[in-house]
Amino acid sequence: MPMRAWLDAALLTRPPRLLHALLPGCEWTGPCHALSGAPIIYLTFDDGPIPDETPWVLEQLALFEAKATFFCVGQNLERCPDIARAALAAGHRVGNHTHQHRSAWATGRASYLDDAAECQVIIGELDGVKPGGSDYQSPRSLFRPPYGRLTWSLLRDLRADYRVIMWSVLTRDYNPSLSPESCLRDTLATVRPGDVLVFHDSQKASARLRFVLPRVLTHLAGQGYQFSAL
């Protein structure tokens, strides 16, 4: 593998600790290990829900009794609320990925926060939690910024209402220039107990997602891992 490609895979697949220091208060790994002592992996899926891809993901997770967290775009939740409810009914969690998949580097602070709040209202309606209720937009609500992009001021504001979840392993399934085999290889070479893995339940990622996810589940389950929601 050429040096530039190797560095790209190393930096993107597992973010360097410098990023942890630059974004204090974000969660980059999972909160705990199983009481049984079995290692845990936290699977997360960004950008859904959408027809075909998200139901397929739910089917794959069910085969392994795996729980996961879906960071959903509000507009997609409006289009496919039944898919999100199916995820909740199966014991998965739904987190906030903004309403319009906004980049924090290209959106004003107030507009970005309003966009996140709009998505959270929809999530609350799915959960049966009403705005203004004791659990509405609580500190236990989950948020992941699209593209992993944040500013310090936005991070400060978001942490008042959310756990801001980043990741420790990025599968890069969204990248059409990568082969499914390379995504799988880099992911399995990097993963370790407590990691938060990012997949994308999107049309763009479909070919790589459908190759990588079942193989990751099979490989890690064979090593005794459990799969938990955040």
Where are these regions (language model features)?
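Helix-enriched interaction subdomains in cytosolic or periplasmic regions
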Residues: M1-R14
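Structural detector of well-ordered beta-strand residues that form the stable sheet scaffold
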Residues: Y42, T69-F71, G95, R144, ...
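Conserved nucleotide-state-sensing and coupling region of NTP-binding domains
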Residues: L220
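Domain-start "cap" segments at the beginnings of catalytic or binding domains
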Residues: Q120, L126-W167
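Active-site beta->alpha N-cap acidic-glycine motif
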Residues: L12-T107, S111, A117-E118, I122-V129, ...
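His/Asp/Glu-enriched short active-site or ligand-binding loop at hydrolase and phosphoryl-transfer sites
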Residues: R149-T190, G224-L230
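Short histidine/acidic/glycine/proline-rich micro-motifs that form metal-
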Residues: D47, C72-L77, Q100-S103, R149, ...
